[in-house]
């Protein structure tokens, strides 16, 4: 069964077409980004030709974009990120640019969408609005790079946002919340945050959660499942994956390591 997940202003959906087919003309109410995962897929626009997608090509469709879908021989599998109007209003940076359909044969646009798909397929519990907004900012920033501005000096709000995430990594913050507090567009916020701190906002939040979990694991006797929830992870498996990415060690092994007080030699420094 195709995978689907609705979170706040977003819908993440997989579509599987097993056979060659030409669908009748249709249009959707909401803007969306589509990634062709495998197979052959083409959108036919009456009177305007068509756009043929190869695997890992990404496309954008504005609301009410009338078209027909043609699935090639052997079928196709696609991933779509749908934006409710509130999300579209926050993120789509140039009305003129986003009023027409777009197609990108570009890894920087495709890979954040692909990461959302792999999370949907393997660990949907780890997805939340903050992570989705961070990935969407990557997509839009790459697709619209020639319209993005770069800061030459570190804005004060970068450190303010960093402190907000560090102080409350387990909270319900969103990228759009932090951008609004900074007085900048969400795409500019995410790009500038990474420019000066070297990581995406969601990566920074992940590290802050791991740090909180480390403190709880060594200073309390809470079961690791409760440590995970207290630090903001969806569950213990979510925390274990994050520990592996950030520290290269499992939470249980980290706790055991720091609770082993046997002397290993003279103290240094």
Protein language model features and the residues they cover:
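Jelly-roll (double-stranded beta-helix
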Residues: 22-24, 98-103, 125-130, 148, ...
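Solvent-exposed, amphipathic alpha-helical segments
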Residues: 109-123, 157-168, 212, 216-220
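Terminal helix-turn-helix DNA-binding modules in bacterial transcription factors
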Residues: 163-176, 195-240, 246-249, 253-269
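Short, Lys/Arg-enriched anionic-surface-contact patches
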Residues: 148-156, 191, 199-208
């Amino acid at each position: 069964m195709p995978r689907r997940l609705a979170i706040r202003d977003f819908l993440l959906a997989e579509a599987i077409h097993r056979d060659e087919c030409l669908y009748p003309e249709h249009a959707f109410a909401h803007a969306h980004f589509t990634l062709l995962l495998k197979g052959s897929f083409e959108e036919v626009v009456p009177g305007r030709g068509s756009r043929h997608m190869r695997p890992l090509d990404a496309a954008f469709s504005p609301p009410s974009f009338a078209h027909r879908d043609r699935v090639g021989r052997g079928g196709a599998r696609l991933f779509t990120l749908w934006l409710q109007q509130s999300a579209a209003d926050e993120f789509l940076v140039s009305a003129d640019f986003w009023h027409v359909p777009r197609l990108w044969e570009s890894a920087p646009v495709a890979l954040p969408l692909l990461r959302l798909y792999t999370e949907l397929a393997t660990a949907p519990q780890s997805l939340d609005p903050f992570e989705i907004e961070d990935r969407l900012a990557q997509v839009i920033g790459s697709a619209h790079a020639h319209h993005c501005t770069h800061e030459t000096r570190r804005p004060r709000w970068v450190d303010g946002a960093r402190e907000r995430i560090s102080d409350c990594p387990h909270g319900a913050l969103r990228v759009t919340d932090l951008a609004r507090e900074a007085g900048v567009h969400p795409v500019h916020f995410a790009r500038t945050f990474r420019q000066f701190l070297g990581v995406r906002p969601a990566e920074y939040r992940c590290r802050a959660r791991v740090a909180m979990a480390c403190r709880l694991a060594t200073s309390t006797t809470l079961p690791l499942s409760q440590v995970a929830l207290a630090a903001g992870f969806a569950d213990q498996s979510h925390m274990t994956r994050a520990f592996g990415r950030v520290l290269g060690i499992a939470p249980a092994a980290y706790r055991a390591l720091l609770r082993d007080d046997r002397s290993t030699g003279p103290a240094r420094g």
